[in-house]
């Protein structure tokens, strides 16, 4: 006896994927360009910290902008450090130093410890 067809799970709140196709006049389907964002990751972290709290799309836009800004600052500083030391590769050491230079006091300490933890987890999983 065949099993009843299962419906696709409802998309999670906060994950916005541009997979819808725009209809052209001549009947051809055209894929919409994907807009990359950190929204799904921000949402996952929010649920880890405050499981019963939601986030508005405006607040998500602000968070996405914040993550992009911090990413660019850290990448730029790490690039400068690599250039000063005549290195062509940005390693975790450059990233760590860039974080120490950019973030104030206790925030830098926490960021470095979380980053070290993430790198350790990644290398042990390989």
Swiss-Prot record:
Residues 1-12 have a biased composition (Low complexity). The modification ADP-ribosyl glutamic acid is found at residue 3. The modification N6-glutaryllysine is found at residues 17, 35, 44, 47, 109, 117, 121. The modification N-acetylproline is found at residue 2. The modification N6-crotonyllysine is found at residues 6, 12-13, 16-17, 21, 24, 35. The modification N6-lactoyllysine is found at residues 6, 12, 16-17, 21, 24, 44, 86, 109, 117, 121. Glycans are attached at residue 113. The modification N6-succinyllysine is found at residues 35, 117, 121. Monoubiquitination at Lys-35 (H2BK34Ub) by the MSL1/MSL2 dimer is required for histone H3 'Lys-4' (H3K4me) and 'Lys-79' (H3K79me) methylation and transcription activation at specific gene loci, such as HOXA9 and MEIS1 loci. Similarly, monoubiquitination at Lys-121 (H2BK120Ub) by the RNF20/40 complex gives a specific tag for epigenetic transcriptional activation and is also prerequisite for histone H3 'Lys-4' and 'Lys-79' methylation. It also functions cooperatively with the FACT dimer to stimulate elongation by RNA polymerase II. Phosphorylation at Ser-37 (H2BS36ph) by AMPK in response to stress promotes transcription. Phosphorylated on Ser-15 (H2BS14ph) by STK4/MST1 during apoptosis; which facilitates apoptotic chromatin condensation. Also phosphorylated on Ser-15 in response to DNA double strand breaks (DSBs), and in correlation with somatic hypermutation and immunoglobulin class-switch recombination. The modification PolyADP-ribosyl glutamic acid is found at residue 36. Signal peptide: none annotated. There is a cross-link at residues 35, 121 (Glycyl lysine isopeptide (Lys-Gly) (interchain with G-Cter in ubiquitin)). There is a cross-link at residues 6, 21 (Glycyl lysine isopeptide (Lys-Gly) (interchain with G-Cter in SUMO2)). The modification N6-butyryllysine is found at residues 6, 21. The modification N6-(2-hydroxyisobutyryl)lysine is found at residues 6, 13, 21, 24-25, 35, 44, 47, 58, 86, 109, 117, 121. Belongs to the histone H2B family. This is Histone H2B type 1-J. The gene is H2BC11.
